[in-house]
Amino acid sequence: MPDDNENLAQSQSRLFRFVTLLSRHKVDFLVIGGQAEILMGGARVTFDTDLCYDRSPHNLERLASALAEINPSLRGAPAELPFKFDAQALAFGSNYTLVTDIGALDLLGWVEPIGDYNALQASAETHVVRQTPVRTIGLEDLIRIKEHINRPKDRDSLFQLIAIRAIRNEQRKKNTDDHV
């Protein structure tokens, strides 16, 4: 059975592959959920990748083109269910749970209680995975979402996210004090 370090390495490998693919296609997206929590310093194990994507027509075309390379299918749907995952399908829906050649992918066009990509990207952060910049949801937005969803695993995440916020605030205070 893999240990937490192996799970983290596999999780970051999947994330890196998704980020590389989408970046190559110039898709506008943010990493949200458990992967964002990990990039912020949280000790979380997650087996899927959650992304919020811009729903502009050009971005939907780029996203559909990128996803075509990794054979997306609807997670939990019967294999024989006909589904063509293209820009038009993306435009008709908003949130998708997918299985791909890389792994599980949740694509969210709308994230409660905040809104769409544009609302989230206003406070987005940049983290680095394997020397590659990765844009994530902002810490305060992630806390707000976890509070809103309020599942047991989200409540567990809240403890870590609030601790990360406290550490960041303390570091900011220390940096301010050092410059006074």
Question: At which residue positions do the language-model features occur?
Answer:
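Compositionally biased terminal segments of proteins
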Residues: 1-180
